[in-house]
Amino acid sequence: MRAAGIGGICHQRKRGRHRPAPAPHEDLVRRRFVAEEPNRLWCTDITQHPTSEGRVYCAAVLDVFSRQVVGWSIADHIRAELVVDALQMATWRRRPEPGAIVHADRGPQYTSWVFGHRLREAGLLGSMGRAASSVDNTMIESFWSTMQRELLDQQHWTSKAELATAIFEWIEAWYNPPRRHTSLGNLSPTEFENLHTAATAAA
Protein backbone atom coordinates (compact mmCIF):
# COMPACT_ATOMS: atom_id res chain seq x y z
CA MET A 1 0.00 0.00 0.00
CA ARG A 2 2.93 2.35 0.55
CA ALA A 3 4.04 1.65 -3.00
CA ALA A 4 0.61 2.78 -4.16
CA GLY A 5 1.09 6.07 -2.34
CA ILE A 6 -1.34 5.23 0.42
CA GLY A 7 0.26 5.54 3.81
CA GLY A 8 -2.18 3.99 7.67
CA ILE A 9 -7.99 1.61 10.05
CA CYS A 10 -9.81 0.49 13.39
CA HIS A 11 -13.25 0.65 14.85
CA GLN A 12 -13.12 -2.89 16.07
CA ARG A 13 -10.83 -1.81 18.85
CA LYS A 14 -7.15 -2.55 18.65
CA ARG A 15 -6.83 -3.39 22.33
CA GLY A 16 -5.87 -6.97 22.94
CA ARG A 17 -3.99 -8.76 25.69
CA HIS A 18 -1.22 -6.19 25.97
CA ARG A 19 -1.09 -4.34 29.25
CA PRO A 20 -1.00 -0.57 28.54
CA ALA A 21 2.32 1.11 29.13
CA PRO A 22 2.58 3.89 31.71
CA ALA A 23 1.44 7.14 30.10
CA PRO A 24 4.41 9.36 29.20
CA HIS A 25 2.03 12.36 29.12
CA GLU A 26 -0.59 13.61 31.56
CA ASP A 27 -4.19 14.17 30.49
CA LEU A 28 -4.27 17.83 29.42
CA VAL A 29 -7.78 17.55 27.97
CA ARG A 30 -9.79 15.81 30.72
CA ARG A 31 -12.71 15.14 28.34
CA ARG A 32 -13.03 18.85 27.48
CA PHE A 33 -12.83 18.71 23.70
CA VAL A 34 -13.05 22.43 23.01
CA ALA A 35 -10.77 24.65 20.91
CA GLU A 36 -11.19 28.32 20.05
CA GLU A 37 -9.26 28.11 16.78
CA PRO A 38 -7.76 25.53 14.43
CA ASN A 39 -4.55 23.65 15.23
CA ARG A 40 -4.66 24.13 18.99
CA LEU A 41 -6.04 20.72 19.99
CA TRP A 42 -5.85 17.52 17.95
CA CYS A 43 -7.00 14.04 18.92
CA THR A 44 -5.68 10.85 17.35
CA ASP A 45 -6.46 7.14 17.39
CA ILE A 46 -6.38 3.92 15.34
CA THR A 47 -9.15 1.77 13.89
CA GLN A 48 -9.14 -1.52 11.98
CA HIS A 49 -11.40 -3.41 9.59
CA PRO A 50 -11.20 -6.85 7.93
CA THR A 51 -10.93 -7.69 4.24
CA SER A 52 -10.64 -11.04 2.47
CA GLU A 53 -6.87 -10.49 2.44
CA GLY A 54 -6.56 -9.54 6.10
CA ARG A 55 -6.97 -6.46 8.25
CA VAL A 56 -6.38 -2.86 7.26
CA TYR A 57 -5.43 -0.28 9.89
CA CYS A 58 -5.99 3.45 9.84
CA ALA A 59 -4.65 6.16 12.12
CA ALA A 60 -6.26 9.60 11.98
CA VAL A 61 -5.57 13.01 13.50
CA LEU A 62 -8.70 15.13 14.05
CA ASP A 63 -8.75 18.88 14.69
CA VAL A 64 -11.12 19.47 17.60
CA PHE A 65 -12.05 22.99 16.41
CA SER A 66 -13.59 21.91 13.11
CA ARG A 67 -13.63 18.08 13.30
CA GLN A 68 -11.50 18.08 10.18
CA VAL A 69 -9.18 15.12 9.58
CA VAL A 70 -5.84 16.88 9.26
CA GLY A 71 -3.70 13.74 9.00
CA TRP A 72 -4.21 10.06 8.33
CA SER A 73 -2.26 6.91 7.53
CA ILE A 74 -3.41 3.55 6.16
CA ALA A 75 -1.40 0.32 6.35
CA ASP A 76 -1.60 -3.45 6.78
CA HIS A 77 0.28 -3.28 10.10
CA ILE A 78 -0.15 -1.57 13.46
CA ARG A 79 3.43 -0.62 14.22
CA ALA A 80 4.36 2.80 15.60
CA GLU A 81 5.12 4.21 12.16
CA LEU A 82 1.38 4.02 11.41
CA VAL A 83 0.63 6.79 13.92
CA VAL A 84 3.86 8.66 13.18
CA ASP A 85 2.91 8.89 9.49
CA ALA A 86 -0.51 10.33 10.38
CA LEU A 87 1.10 12.88 12.71
CA GLN A 88 3.66 13.87 10.10
CA MET A 89 0.93 14.45 7.52
CA ALA A 90 -0.94 16.65 10.00
CA THR A 91 2.11 18.74 10.91
CA TRP A 92 3.14 19.11 7.26
CA ARG A 93 -0.33 20.23 6.22
CA ARG A 94 -1.15 22.50 9.14
CA ARG A 95 2.15 23.82 10.54
CA PRO A 96 0.78 24.13 14.09
CA GLU A 97 2.36 26.60 16.47
CA PRO A 98 4.46 25.24 19.35
CA GLY A 99 2.35 24.23 22.32
CA ALA A 100 -0.52 22.70 20.37
CA ILE A 101 -1.89 19.58 22.11
CA VAL A 102 -2.12 16.10 20.58
CA HIS A 103 -4.42 13.84 22.63
CA ALA A 104 -4.25 10.04 22.33
CA ASP A 105 -4.90 6.86 24.28
CA ARG A 106 -2.21 4.77 25.98
CA GLY A 107 -1.74 2.30 23.15
CA PRO A 108 1.84 1.14 22.58
CA GLN A 109 2.03 3.10 19.32
CA TYR A 110 1.36 6.37 21.15
CA THR A 111 3.60 5.58 24.12
CA SER A 112 6.46 4.64 21.79
CA TRP A 113 9.69 6.59 21.82
CA VAL A 114 9.41 7.49 18.14
CA PHE A 115 5.95 9.06 18.49
CA GLY A 116 7.08 11.09 21.50
CA HIS A 117 10.18 12.15 19.56
CA ARG A 118 8.07 13.40 16.65
CA LEU A 119 5.90 15.38 19.06
CA ARG A 120 8.95 17.04 20.57
CA GLU A 121 10.46 17.77 17.16
CA ALA A 122 7.28 19.60 16.15
CA GLY A 123 6.99 21.45 19.47
CA LEU A 124 3.70 19.71 20.28
CA LEU A 125 2.42 18.70 23.72
CA GLY A 126 1.35 15.10 24.20
CA SER A 127 -1.77 14.30 26.22
CA MET A 128 -3.18 10.91 27.20
CA GLY A 129 -6.41 9.70 28.73
CA ARG A 130 -6.83 6.70 30.99
CA ALA A 131 -6.15 3.18 29.79
CA ALA A 132 -9.05 1.46 27.96
CA SER A 133 -11.34 4.49 28.35
CA SER A 134 -13.08 5.47 25.11
CA VAL A 135 -14.79 8.44 26.79
CA ASP A 136 -11.37 10.03 27.31
CA ASN A 137 -11.05 10.32 23.51
CA THR A 138 -14.72 10.61 22.67
CA MET A 139 -14.49 12.96 19.69
CA ILE A 140 -12.38 10.67 17.55
CA GLU A 141 -14.38 7.66 18.74
CA SER A 142 -17.42 9.44 17.28
CA PHE A 143 -15.51 9.92 14.03
CA TRP A 144 -14.74 6.19 13.83
CA SER A 145 -18.41 5.37 14.48
CA THR A 146 -19.37 7.61 11.57
CA MET A 147 -16.84 5.94 9.28
CA GLN A 148 -18.02 2.51 10.40
CA ARG A 149 -21.65 3.34 9.68
CA GLU A 150 -21.21 5.26 6.43
CA LEU A 151 -18.37 3.29 4.83
CA LEU A 152 -16.85 0.25 6.48
CA ASP A 153 -20.06 -1.69 7.14
CA GLN A 154 -21.60 -0.90 3.76
CA GLN A 155 -20.07 -3.90 1.98
CA HIS A 156 -17.66 -6.80 2.17
CA TRP A 157 -14.16 -5.66 1.22
CA THR A 158 -12.28 -8.02 -1.06
CA SER A 159 -8.77 -6.58 -0.92
CA LYS A 160 -6.70 -4.35 1.33
CA ALA A 161 -6.03 -1.97 -1.55
CA GLU A 162 -9.77 -1.64 -2.25
CA LEU A 163 -10.52 -0.69 1.34
CA ALA A 164 -7.51 1.62 1.64
CA THR A 165 -8.61 3.52 -1.45
CA ALA A 166 -12.19 3.75 -0.17
CA ILE A 167 -11.03 5.19 3.17
CA PHE A 168 -8.82 7.74 1.43
CA GLU A 169 -11.70 8.86 -0.80
CA TRP A 170 -14.19 8.94 2.09
CA ILE A 171 -11.95 11.22 4.17
CA GLU A 172 -10.64 13.54 1.47
CA ALA A 173 -13.61 13.71 -0.93
CA TRP A 174 -16.55 13.31 1.48
CA TYR A 175 -15.92 13.76 5.19
CA ASN A 176 -13.75 16.90 5.12
CA PRO A 177 -15.20 18.92 2.22
CA PRO A 178 -18.99 18.42 1.95
CA ARG A 179 -20.23 16.31 4.87
CA ARG A 180 -22.24 18.58 7.17
CA HIS A 181 -22.26 18.42 10.98
CA THR A 182 -25.03 19.72 13.20
CA SER A 183 -22.37 20.57 15.80
CA LEU A 184 -20.77 22.93 13.24
CA GLY A 185 -23.98 24.78 12.41
CA ASN A 186 -24.76 22.41 9.54
CA LEU A 187 -21.44 23.18 7.86
CA SER A 188 -18.74 20.77 6.74
CA PRO A 189 -15.34 20.84 8.50
CA THR A 190 -13.79 22.64 5.52
CA GLU A 191 -16.61 25.18 5.32
CA PHE A 192 -16.44 25.82 9.07
CA GLU A 193 -12.70 26.51 8.95
CA ASN A 194 -13.04 28.71 5.86
CA LEU A 195 -15.69 30.77 7.63
CA HIS A 196 -13.43 31.17 10.65
CA THR A 197 -10.49 32.19 8.45
CA ALA A 198 -12.59 34.81 6.65
CA ALA A 199 -13.95 36.21 9.92
CA THR A 200 -10.45 36.39 11.41
CA ALA A 201 -9.10 38.19 8.34
CA ALA A 202 -11.95 40.70 8.44
CA ALA A 203 -11.55 41.45 12.16
Please tell me what each predicted stretch does:
Residues M1-A203:
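Charged DNA-binding/catalytic regions of mobile-element recombinases
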